[in-house]
Structures are given as structure tokens and as C-alpha cells.
């Protein structure tokens, strides 16, 4: 047995997963010279800016990403150094902690000094550009990093190969960008790397992934043609690092002073509130702001599919559901919202918060409210009639006698607002608040 090599018993070394693609795999259309500029701002000073303008060809509004370019020598140096960092730097040193950027730039600086002779034509400004791209691809989101870094963008979506990346802009709503993937394999690899960075798995056997990226952005993706005939797709729902407080919502006009005082009074008395609305209407934002009104000394338990809530409380237990990766169809190891809501009752919470109810967990939530626990949750519905109809129908199956346990329902909608000077903007408004007296008996 001497000299026998068994490489399959060796532990595979972990490598840095750079979110980078080759130039021929992604297209970034240049900014047209005669574009009609509607808005312009920097995301990374000197290196990356956003220009929103009307395309001279189609006349449509386009979100242009304009990044500093690397010349041939700078590109060669970048590829050399990024390859060395990806192979040699310990992932623990370049992870999600606050020292990641510092560690990366320190290593990049060391390697740039080492290879200065090999790349004599690269100037100091050129090395600064290289460091920008290293940080973009090793710590950020690669070609989409500028878009993700734009706080004005709420959603980023890719519908497939040779289709522009679309963004949902706070002022201009859904508009295409000048970026698109040209290669199926490159798009597949990009999704795999995003999933890897979020600690999730995606493959042909498990082609749907729902994960939380660093920065608390929510990733939903489909892999290859398993469930999406056009190939891989993804959408990234962005969230603020500092969530809106109830005061912020009042100042923005989302809710009125009277509404804020009313909700505060309800929460002080451990009442139950349900937030309803359509997709992207701001239900989670309202839910987070309401939960921040709960007394600091109370015990909170939150149950979510992905960790979106961000609360200031110390006495807070956060539960997140887990999908099964079994191949037998038995869902071995899956932990559902229903399981977590049942478990949360053993923690004796003062307030139980469910990110969104849509299944059998609703029944357990109402059981908890019946025993004196405060409750907060969201539900997809356009009005209170549809909301109650969903609650009493399968798969929620909440008894009609439990409906009065909901003290108040708030409807949040996305609306179009006039600008002070010209044009329109998009905002969120609480359109209606109901008190629930009984089944099918509501007061607004």
C-alpha cells in the first residue's frame, strides 16, 4: 500500500468564489454620446456612476452603468492577481466580516508590489482601478455590483440570456439596464456563485433557491431549463441596512401621525395587527416599523422563510425555515414555517411575528393569539375581504370564530405621486385601516 494515492479521501480545499465573468460572456453597452440624460450620480467616486437617460435608438428610459475601463495591461494584471487571491487567500480572511475589505486590499497591495516589474506599464492610477475591480468581484456582485450598490434600486432581475438586466428604480419604476448575459454557462455560474456566497445549494436536482445574500438582500433564482424553459433566471430584492422607523414612515407620508399613534397604542396593549398588500407594496417595511414599537423588555420571536426583519430588541429569537434536499420526495430534514411557529410557542413570547402567512402556520398563529400572545404578520391580499377569504380557506383553514382575534388590518399600496417640479414618482401609502369586530364585520 506504500505510495498508493487516494485523492478522493483528501479534504477539498475551500477557495474564494469570485463573482466575475469574462468580457465575452457579459455585454455592457457603452453610454451613447447623444443620450438625453435624465439623472446622473456616482456610486463609487471616480470608478462607477449611473446615468439614466432616454436611448437615442428607441426613446425608452435606460439605466446605464458606466464603469472605468481597464486597458489590456491592467486587465492582464487584474486576472493574474485575482487568480492568486482566489487560490491562496483563506476564505475566512475574506468573508462577510468587517475586515474583509481591509484584508483584500492588503493582499492586493502586496501582490501589486510583487508584480510591478512584470507589469511595468501599469501606472499607480491603473493599480487603483485594479483594486476597484478586485473588490467588486471578490467581495461584491461582479458586473451587477454598481446596481446593487445603488440605494435607489429596489429590485434587480435577470430573465435569461441576451435579455437586459431590469431594475425597479424608486423614481423610474421598471427600466432596462445596459447589461446582459451573453452565455448560458456564464449565467449558470453566476447563480451558483451567488448561492454559494449565501451558504445555499442550487443544482439541476434542486433548481430553485431562495436565499439571503450578504447585505440582507433576498435572492430567488431558477437554475438552467429545469423549471424555466429559457434558462436560468434570478431576482434580487434589496433591503436597507438601516430599516425605516415609524418616524421615517410618518415623515415620508407613508402613514399619518394618527395612524402611528393608533398602532403604538395597539402594540402597547399587545394587540394583533395584520399588514396586507400586493407584491412589493412595502408590507415587510411596515411590519418591521411596527415591531420596533414593541417594548424593549418584551420577548419577541420571529418566524420567516428568509431573514428579512431587522429589530433593535435584545430579547429576540429569530427563526428561519429550512428546505429539504432529499431525493426521495419525503422532504427529510425540512423545517417549515408550521414547525417553527409551533416551536416558538415554547419560548413564551410576548409577541410572535410571522413574516408572511400563506399556509397551515396561520392556524397555529391564531391559536397563539387565542392564548394571549401578541401577533404581527403580513398577508398577500388587495383588500380585507380577500384577506379574510384566504385565511378561512385551504391551506390556512383558520376558523371563522378566530377571525376577531385580529384587532386591526392595514392595507399598504404602491402609488404614483406628483413631483414638486415635474414628472411623477413612486411611493407607498397606507390606504386603509380596519378594526375587526367579527367575521365579515369590519370598521374603518
What are these model-derived regions, one by one?
Residues 139-150, 195-210, 298, 396-399, ...:
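Active-site phosphate-binding and catalytic loops of NTP-dependent enzymes
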Residues 408-444:
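Conserved P-loop NTPase
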Residues 158-272, 314:
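P-loop NTP-binding catalytic core
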Residues 262-279, 289-415:
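Switch/coupling sub-region of P-loop NTPases
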Residues 69-70, 162-163, 172-173, 183, ...:
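Conserved nucleotide-binding/hydrolysis micro-motifs of P-loop NTPases
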Residues 1-198, 214:
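N-terminal accessory targeting/assembly segments
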Amino acid at each position: 500500500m506504500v505510495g498508493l494515492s487516494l485523492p478522493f479521501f483528501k479534504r477539498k480545499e475551500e477557495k474564494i468564489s469570485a463573482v466575475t465573468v469574462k468580457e465575452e460572456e457579459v455585454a455592457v453597452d457603452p453610454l451613447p454620446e447623444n443620450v438625453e440624460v435624465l439623472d446622473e450620480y456616482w456610486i463609487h467616486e471616480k470608478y462607477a456612476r449611473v446615468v439614466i437617460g432616454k436611448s437615442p435608438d428607441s426613446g425608452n428610459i435606460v439605466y446605464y452603468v458606466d464603469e472605468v475601463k481597464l486597458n489590456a495591461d491592467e486587465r492582464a494584471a487584474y486576472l493574474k492577481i485575482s487568480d492568486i487571491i482566489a487560490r491562496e487567500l483563506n476564505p475566512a480572511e475574506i468573508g462577510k466580516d468587517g475586515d474583509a475589505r481591509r484584508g483584500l486590499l492588503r493582499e492586493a497591495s502586496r501582490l501589486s508590489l510583487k508584480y510591478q516589474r512584470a507589469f511595468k506599464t501599469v501606472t499607480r492610477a491603473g493599480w487603483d482601478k485594479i483594486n476597484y475591480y478586485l473588490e467588486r468581484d471578490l467581495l461584491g456582485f461582479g458586473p451587477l455590483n454598481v446596481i446593487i450598490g445603488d440605494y435607489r434600486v429596489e429590485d434587480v432581475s435577470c430573465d435569461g440570456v441576451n435579455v437586459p438586466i431590469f431594475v425597479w428604480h424608486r423614481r423610474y419604476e421598471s427600466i432596462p439596464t445596459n447589461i446582459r448575459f451573453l452565455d448560458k454557462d456564464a449565467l449558470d455560474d453566476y447563480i451558483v456563485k451567488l448561492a454559494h456566497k449565501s451558504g445555499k445549494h442550487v443544482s439541476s436536482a434542486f433548481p430553485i433557491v431562495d436565499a439571503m445574500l450578504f447585505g440582507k438582500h433576498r435572492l430567488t433564482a431558477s437554475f438552467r431549463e429545469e423549471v424555466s424553459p429559457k434558462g436560468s433566471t434570478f431576482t434580487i430584492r434589496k433591503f436597507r441596512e438601516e430599516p425605516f422607523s415609524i418616524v421615517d414612515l410618518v415623515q415620508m407620508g407613508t402613514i399619518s401621525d394618527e395612524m402611528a399613534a393608533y398602532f403604538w397604542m395597539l402594540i402597547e396593549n399587545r394587540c394583533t395587527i395584520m399588514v396586507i398588500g400586493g407584491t412589493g407594496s412595502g408590507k415587510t417595511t411596515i411590519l418591521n416599523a411596527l415591531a420596533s414599537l414593541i417594548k424593549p423588555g418584551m420577548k419577541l420571536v420571529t418566524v420567516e422563510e428568509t431573514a428579512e426583519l431587522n429589530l433593535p430588541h435584545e430579547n429576540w429569537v429569530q427563526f428561519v425555515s429550512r428546505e429539504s434536499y432529499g431525493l426521495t420526495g419525503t422532504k427529510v430534514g425540512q423545517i417549515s414555517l408550521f414547525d417553527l411557529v409551533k416551536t416558538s410557542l415554547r419560548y413564551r413570547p410576548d409577541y410572535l411575528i410571522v413574516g408572511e402567512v400563506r399556509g397551515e402556520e396561520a392556524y397555529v398563529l391564531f391559536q397563539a393569539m387565542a392564548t394571549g400572545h401578541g401577533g404581527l404578520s403580513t398577508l398577500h391580499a388587495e383588500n380585507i375581504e380577500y384577506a379574510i377569504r384566504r385565511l378561512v380557506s385551504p391551506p390556512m383553514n383558520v376558523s371563522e370564530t378566530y377571525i376577531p382575534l385580529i384587532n386591526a388590518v392595514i392595507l399598504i399600496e404602491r402609488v404614483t405621486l406628483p413631483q414638486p417640479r415635474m414628472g411623477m414618482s413612486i411611493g407607498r401609502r397606507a390606504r386603509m385601516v380596519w378594526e375587526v369586530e367579527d367575521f365579515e364585520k369590519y370598521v374603518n
